From Swiss-Prot:
Record family assignment: Belongs to the delta endotoxin family.
Organismal lineage: Bacteria, Bacillati, Bacillota, Bacilli, Bacillales
Comment field (misc): Toxic segment of the protein is located in the N-terminus.
Descriptive protein name: Pesticidal crystal protein Cry3Ca
Function as written in the Swiss-Prot or TrEMBL entry: Promotes colloidosmotic lysis by binding to the midgut epithelial cells of Coleoptera.
Key word Nucleotide-binding present: no
Keyword Metal-binding among record annotations: no
Database matches in InterPro entries: Galactose-bd-like_sf, Pest_crys, Pest_crys_dom-III, Pest_crys_dom_I, Pest_crys_N_sf, Pest_cryst_cen_dom_sf, Pest_cryst_dom_II
Pfam families referenced in this protein's UniProt entry, alphabetically: Endotoxin_C, Endotoxin_M, Endotoxin_N
Bias-annotated ranges (Polar residues): 14-25
GO-annotated biological processes: sporulation resulting in formation of a cellular spore; symbiont-mediated killing of host cell
Name of the gene encoding the protein in the UniProt record: cry3Ca
Provenance organism: Bacillus thuringiensis subsp. kurstaki
Keywords, sorted A to Z: Sporulation, Toxin, Virulence
Amino acid sequence: MNPNNRSEHDTIKATENNEVSNNHAQYPLADTPTLEELNYKEFLRRTTDNNVEALDSSTTKDAIQKGISIIGDLLGVVGFPYGGALVSFYTNLLNTIWPGEDPLKAFMQQVEALIDQKIADYAKDKATAELQGLKNVFKDYVSALDSWDKTPLTLRDGRSQGRIRELFSQAESHFRRSMPSFAVSGYEVLFLPTYAQAANTHLLLLKDAQIYGTDWGYSTDDLNEFHTKQKDLTIEYTNHCAKWYKAGLDKLRGSTYEEWVKFNRYRREMTLTVLDLITLFPLYDVRTYTKGVKTELTRDVLTDPIVAVNNMNGYGTTFSNIENYIRKPHLFDYLHAIQFHSRLQPGYFGTDSFNYWSGNYVSTRSSIGSDEIIRSPFYGNKSTLDVQNLEFNGEKVFRAVANGNLAVWPVGTGGTKIHSGVTKVQFSQYNDRKDEVRTQTYDSKRNVGGIVFDSIDQLPPITTDESLEKAYSHQLNYVRCFLLQGGRGIIPVFTWTHKSVDFYNTLDSEKITQIPFVKAFILVNSTSVVAGPGFTGGDIIKCTNGSGLTLYVTPAPDLTYSKTYKIRIRYASTSQVRFGIDLGSYTHSISYFDKTMDKGNTLTYNSFNLSSVSRPIEISGGNKIGVSVGGIGSGDEVYIDKIEFIPMD
């Protein structure tokens, strides 16, 4: 049994004094090409004036804000929304992605900045024209839908039916014809957020045919045709986005620190504007999701390394030294505590010396089901000053603001040796069960310098209409440090997960509840966590014969009695597979699911199937639910993504 599958904790190499080994190449102290000709005062002026990274433009932030806002709104309406809620969502969608005369411009400019490539004028002009047309037809459709919903049933007639059918058909066909303009050969990656947003709107539109089609006068054959089209396009759009996201990411792999920063920014920003969105596409199928859906995104995103200087050329760590040691796929956990270690960094003049964050331990806990606290290996260099402990105990850290400082030593003739350090971090945290906000601070207490990092700049809130503790989009769940070249300091990197994650795996009494299997707290035998294929909202579980897992679910808080749920599992398998469902210590049901893919195939959207187990489950109080996998041959593989609980009326 492997209770935690925290394999990344086994890959960190430590020195005899328990410090992370610095086994990358050492750069000469004065070998900083962009700085060595500067005198000390000129360097200080340059670093003060140039302390904001070039890619943090207002356009990029605008695109990220739009992407996060759309996901936040969608999470509130996925499933089977009716009437006013749907029209209100569409109105917000129009105001978010199509507010002016240049629709989705921010998304195009975002990727141009990320991969340092421009979209050719002919392709951009055609895409922009198509987007303007889509905006117009969708706006007309939403206006007609609003009028339809507000018209009493007794006043709806054949003319009003014909009018809304006409506008729906115009909008749907316009989207279908326009999509190739956002997949122009050679520009697939550059157009990817634009493609994803257009695809999302098209699939939402097709969903409406299933909700309203009968009232609009469509025949059963028409509705079946629309539904088939929706399912086929969900596959096409999802696979396109996952494929070209990966192609763009692979192209950005490099060897230097600066290349890793760009690589990670692409990964983070494309997750926020593309991958999070396509994760929700299956939920638009209202024949499958006949109720509202409570779902969550368990994927990790990393904010930029925290440094006190913009230009790290020559003394940043290497691409591989960061990428090889960030967290590998893991069971979901939440932040319990951080132990901060500090050291003194002498300054050239003495008075410019400062204390800095030199290393840390991280303690985490599984989402629910186990009281075990898992302590990480030590990251960085052990403290020569007092250790500081901050405990969060599951409260959601929604913002981190860091201060930093620099020590610059002249070397040789005109050269410089730069030391960078994080000197103070203020963590804002929210207890959603008590509706309480508080802050905790790591403080090195000596020359803390100015603010060099605010997580909100890279992970903005869902909306600016509410206070930040209610509107935040992400919560901190891991921290680790990396050594700069030549012992020049430490760069911390924060890992965040989406606000939608429910630590308690709480079932909804009215909605369908999706729980990713990475929310389990026990893995059995050869069960392992592997990276998701890009459209699952996080990592997934890989099983072989005889493997399994256990997760804990919490009953709906509004229930004082038991509730019965149908169970579905989203899975991919290279052979027929037997799923066993256990409640506590007894076997509740055995189900056999079909093969979905061939051995050796890459996981795509159509590799997965959603199948129901043979018996419903009655939930009363907290329940441990075991899932076992069997009946497959040697070399066969089973991947499980989510379990769904569908309340029975």
